[in-house]
């Protein structure tokens, strides 16, 4: 009887050991069948680089930065109230912009755009002028404002930067003309004034070009 009880007790003990030993396995198996939840780290959005516009045009006089000047019709580009040509047909077209002594004084003239001085010369109607050709195809003519060659600070072949001193206004006004190298702006005498009387796209509005660039 005692032997039988011992065998029963031993059997029960073995069963208990097997049960307890299997618990971790069951736990493992249950976890193995469960879907795994993966934590995904959100990527921080890349900061967009702000594109800063590099100004490449500027006013020919510092005073224009300081205050708004109201120019007269005759000083502005385009059709004006002043006749420019009588024969063979009348024309009121102005091929540039005039900056007068009354607005800017006898002050320093600054380069409105970078480029290379093509010529410093005299021509009837233009007076002493500075002819600049820029790498991007623009052409700038500073004319009618220099009474003496000593009023001009640059020379032929010189590379100039935006805002560099061109000379000094000593006349009544500086006429600034802007065109492009692909335009037929040179007359038969080699002077950069062809179609000065005609609004055919040869000459461009200087103030629009300058102020559009500054405003970007």
Spans of features found by a protein language model:
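Short acidic/polar mixed-charge low-complexity motifs
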Residues: 105, 136-139, 202
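Short glycine/proline-centered loop/turn elements that form peptide/ligand docking sites
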Residues: 153-154, 165, 170-174
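Sec-dependent N-terminal signal peptides
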Residues: 3-28
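Zn2+-dependent peptidoglycan hydrolase active-site motif and core
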Residues: 111-151, 173-180
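Acidic, glycine-rich catalytic/binding loops that coordinate metals and/or anionic ligands
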Residues: 53-55, 62, 152-161, 178-216
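Short, solvent-exposed loop/turn positions at domain surfaces
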Residues: 103-105, 148, 154
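Acidic surface patches and DE-rich sequence motifs
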Residues: 71, 123, 134, 187, ...
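Surface-exposed, glycine-biased beta-strand/turn segments
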Residues: 30-128, 161-162, 171, 204-216
């Amino acid at each position: 009887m005692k032997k039988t009880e011992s065998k029963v007790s031993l059997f029960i003990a073995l069963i208990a050991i097997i049960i307890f030993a299997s618990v971790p396995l069951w736990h493992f198996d249950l976890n193995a069948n469960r879907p795994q939840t993966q934590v995904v780290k959100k990527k921080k959005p890349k900061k967009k680089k702000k594109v800063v516009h590099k100004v490449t045009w500027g006013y020919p006089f510092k005073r224009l930065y300081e205050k708004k000047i109201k120019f007269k019709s005759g000083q502005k580009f385009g059709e004006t109230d002043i006749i420019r040509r009588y024969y063979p047909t009348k024309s009121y077209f102005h091929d540039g912009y005039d900056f007068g002594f009354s607005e800017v004084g006898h002050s320093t003239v600054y380069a409105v755009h970078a480029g290379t001085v093509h010529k410093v010369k005299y021509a009837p109607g233009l007076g002493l002028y500075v002819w600049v050709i820029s790498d991007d195809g623009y052409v700038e003519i500073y004319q009618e404002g220099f009474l003496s060659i000593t009023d001009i600070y640059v020379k032929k072949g010189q590379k100039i930067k935006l805002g560099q001193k061109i000379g000094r206004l000593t006349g009544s006004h500086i006429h600034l003309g802007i065109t492009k190298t692909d335009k037929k702006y040179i007359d038969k005498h080699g002077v950069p004034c062809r179609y000065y009387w005609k609004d055919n796209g040869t000459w461009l509005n200087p103030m629009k070009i300058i102020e559009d660039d500054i405003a970007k």
